[in-house]
Amino acid sequence: MRYLPLTPEDRADMLGVIGAETIDALFVDVPAVAYRKDPVDLPFHAGELEVEREMLALSRRNRSASEGPFFVGAGAYRHHVPATVDHIIQRSEFLTSYTPYQPEIAQGTLQVLFEFQTQVAALTGMEVANASLYDGSTATAEAVMMATRVTRRGKAVLSGGVHPHYVGTVETLAHAAGVATERLKAAIDAEDAVIAAIDADTACVVVQTPNVFGTATDVSKIAAAAQAAGALLIVVTTEAVSYGLLKSPGEMGADIVVAEGQSIGNGLNFGGPYVGLFACKEKYVRQAPGRLCGETVDADGRRGFVLTLSTREQHIRRDKATSNICTNSGLCALAFSIHMSLLGEKGLRQLALVNHHKAVKLRDALAAVPGVEVLTPRFFNEFAIKVPGNAAELVETLAANGVIGGVPFSRLDPGAGLDNVLLVAATETTPDSDIALFSKALSKVLAPKGSNQ
């Protein structure tokens, strides 16, 4: 079929119907500084081969996480993903953007979502989980919005241990929704400050464990304080593998649990897509965002799966919707579920133990470097260290020596005044030889000038 563009007469008729004189009148709301009327001066188009060469040249400027010692975490973690995961998710039945509106032709997809929800509920220690959200940060923002609906209050208290990017996402959505946010000062252990900030206007308290500094915390006291004030406790986790070793948020009294599920079944990538985990107490389920898959029986009594709750604007009136989450995280949720099924309960615990043991080895190696101070007392697979001078400059120097040595906290929160704090992580993909190389490189970089190190 040929593409037949609109004629000048067609455009004139359409503008006449809406009462506009010119096409430019349609863009009066766009600020003049952002509205470009002249054509963009782009280079002449290239062929497929030339474009491929150009993209390869650009990609060579990047450095893969597998190209050398790599200790980056801070919310996204390098883990081994079995080849089985990618093989299964590429089946045509799964590799689709189709939303399972019609259960009679989507039982496979619906069963996978049901199993995913079951796994997430078990991991988080909660009663019910939804069928995934975009990622951990947007799941956190959705949880805050949900808490304001449940409590009919308008303020969220955000712990100083919550990842700054998550805080930024919450603040963006909260501002648009008219919800006040109280962001506490960044702190390795923020329990006392969080409890002190709770008042009669607080809809929810948002805490993270392990937090952005790696601190693994029992949030039971915060849960008791929040609930005594009529607020909900939202617990955030950025490293889902930690569920295999640490006490679940549900056991500690959480009302809502959100997490980034990238660590299980999904590789590192810049910009996503990742998969947000969302679970809550059953009494709040009708205020939960996204979709929820349920089990039922058909007319012949056979077991089947359907979308039980879909409080999103594609399914119900926009003013009644609690979220506009769509299907883009479904494939990532499937990858999560496949990897979890391959691991099993014992496998996940073993994986978590390996991660912790690797981090302990890293902690011991770095603590022996003169000038380095380990700041995180209790951790899973990530911790913070204090270094002499500027951590961002140190990371650049380490990179020049072949080691990607973590994330400077100042890169996450430039205004926190923690320019000498470096976040480092180790997983099952970190060989002992890389830990030794990191320790050696750090000793060399921090050694006084003129020394023999």
From Swiss-Prot:
The answer to keyword Oxidoreductase applying to this record is yes
SUPFAM superfamilies according to UniProt: PLP-dependent transferases (SSF53383)
Q: Name one GO molecular function term.
A: glycine dehydrogenase (decarboxylating) activity
- Reactions that this protein is recorded to catalyse: N(6)-[(R)-lipoyl]-L-lysyl-[glycine-cleavage complex H protein] + glycine + H(+) = N(6)-[(R)-S(8)-aminomethyldihydrolipoyl]-L-lysyl-[glycine-cleavage complex H protein] + CO2
Record's keyword terms, sorted: Oxidoreductase
Q: Which Pfam families match?
A: GDC-P
> Is Oxidoreductase one of the keywords UniProt gives this record?
yes
**Biological processes, Gene Ontology terms:** glycine decarboxylation via glycine cleavage system; nucleoside metabolic process
Q: What is its EC number?
A: 1.4.4.2
Highest taxon above the source species: Bacteria
Q: How does it assemble?
A: The glycine cleavage system is composed of four proteins: P, T, L and H. In this organism, the P 'protein' is a heterodimer of two subunits.
Q: Which PANTHER family match?
A: GLYCINE CLEAVAGE SYSTEM P-PROTEIN, GLYCINE DEHYDROGENASE (DECARBOXYLATING)
Classification via HAMAP family: GcvPA
Query: Per the similarity annotation, which family is this?
Result: Belongs to the GcvP family. N-terminal subunit subfamily.
Biological function: The glycine cleavage system catalyzes the degradation of glycine. The P protein binds the alpha-amino group of glycine through its pyridoxal phosphate cofactor; CO(2) is released and the remaining methylamine moiety is then transferred to the lipoamide cofactor of the H protein.
Name listed for the protein in its UniProt record:
Probable glycine dehydrogenase (decarboxylating) subunit 1
- The species this protein was found in: Caulobacter sp. (strain K31)
Name of the gene encoding the protein in the UniProt record: gcvPA
